[in-house]
A protein has these predicted regions:
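Conserved N-terminal helical subregion
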Residues: 1-63, 71-73
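Short secondary-structure junctions
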Residues: 19, 86-87, 141-146
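Fold-independent oxyanion-binding glycine-rich loops
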Residues: 26, 53-55, 99-101, 111, ...
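Short, surface-exposed charged micro-motifs
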Residues: 30, 107, 168
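FAD/FMN-dependent oxidoreductases across multiple families
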Residues: 44, 125-200
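Conserved FAD-binding catalytic core of PHBH/FMO-like flavoproteins
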Residues: 57-130
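C-terminal helical "tail/cap" subdomain of flavin- and related membrane-associated enzymes
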Residues: 199-208
């Protein structure tokens, strides 16, 4: 499986090949009447359509006035380097384990030379002890030695927004709450929703 930063870079490069312009270090501070203003410059961009795809926290959707009624579940993931025998044993398949955490699940994804191991839970149903749950899950997987590790926490939107369009603004992907409600995977539906809105705008068919 590919690392997310590598995949994102590929998407950016492909978009640029088709004429997209990448603005870096450009934080949107306001959206009014289709005009985007930025926190670190006086530049303004007027857009006929604004597609908001800024992830689960989606600060831009708040600026656009979208109500956030998604259910967000907390999760933690470790990128771990393990001994060769453990990597060989656990890199043969993708794992989802529904008994890894109370009211949640765990996952173990093989990457090029390490494992991505994490857990996510319904915070309304269980006292959140993500680190403890993940460490226990790794032991259940038979991982007793970790050579190196890095951890990051995040939230996963497992229910969609009631409102996906507001004026000329559209939310897609995790910003819209399109993660799979069973396994909480978001990339597939993010790509599908992006493709759908792009085709609809290209066709001039906003009822799709």
């Amino acid at each position: 499986m590919v690392m997310r930063d590598t995949f994102d870079e590929l998407l950016v490069n492909k978009a640029q090949e088709f004429g997209a312009e990448l603005l870096q270090n450009s934080e949107v501070k306001s959206i009014e009447n289709g005009i985007l203003k930025f926190a670190n410059s006086d530049e303004e961009i007027e857009a006929k359509f604004i597609i908001i795809a800024d992830g689960a926290l989606s600060p831009v959707s708040k600026l656009a006035g979208f109500k956030d009624d998604r259910l967000l579940i907390p999760a933690i993931e470790y990128e771990i380097e393990v001994p060769e025998e453990d990597f060989e044993r656990l890199s043969k398949s993708v794992r989802f384990d529904i008994d890894a955490a109370p009211f949640g699940y765990g996952w173990c994804f093989p990457k090029n030379n390490h494992l991505s191991v994490g857990v996510g839970v319904l915070k309304t149903k269980a006292k959140v002890k993500l680190k403890d749950y993940c460490e226990s899950y790794m032991k259940d997987l038979g991982i007793n030695t970790i050579i190196s590790e890095s951890a990051h926490g995040f939230v996963i939107p497992v229910t969609p927004r009631a409102e996906l369009v507001k004026g000329n603004c559209f939310v897609i992907g995790d910003a819209a709450g399109f993660a799979d409600p069973i396994v909480a995977e978001g990339i597939s539906n993010a790509l599908l929703s992006g493709k759908t809105i792009a085709e609809a705008l290209a066709e001039g068919n906003l009822e799709r």
